């Protein structure tokens, strides 16, 4: 039943050699991202914050049940591993994520955002949401742009025109839209964060599309292209990491 459903959407269940390789790459990238994200957040949380809550945000209700689609974002970024048919496109996706992160981290330092959280009840959804609030940065950090939203739409862009059929692409689009709305309904982000996250996704994707061919040689296989790309990006990423950890010490 599961295989039949996945075939109807165009999702590949088998893990060939390239897919296994890129699963390892993705897990490594996620680990590095998590370390940097936490480091940036713990530094930014000590900075003066700005409350950019708008009148529109005040009209948006808290709907705790949206915590469930919100949490989909933590597995959604792995979807391209199942649906891409051109691994150069996956390299492009990784490059988009790198561009989005480095530029977002800079803004997190310059313009840290915080806003008050609503009171919660004792339902299962509210308890889960309370846990999310508890583990988040206080009073606030890493909000504008919403990388939750950015990653979601980079995933959508990565999956377009790949193994998914029209039904599959439509489902991915609606899941991306649902995750985006959930960021507002669980009060993890304000409208400005979400709008910026959308802009970050599409801008990072466009920049990556233009940069990728300059970072890789002509007619190389995807693995070689990934190595060439990371070799050229490594000095920039290393310098950024040194700056971040140096700032945390002073």
Which residues make up each language-model segment?
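Membrane-interfacial, low-structure loops and terminal tails that flank and connect transmembrane helices
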Residues: 1-19, 214-233
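Membrane-embedded alpha-helical segments of multi-pass membrane proteins
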Residues: 68-76, 146-154, 195-199
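Hydrophobic, membrane-inserted alpha-helices
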Residues: 74-80, 150-157, 174-182
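Interfacial helix-loop-helix junctions of multi-pass membrane proteins
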Residues: 122, 140-144, 177-206
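Hydrophobic transmembrane alpha-helices
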Residues: 156-160, 201-212
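Final/C-terminal transmembrane alpha-helix of multipass membrane proteins
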Residues: 177-178, 230-249
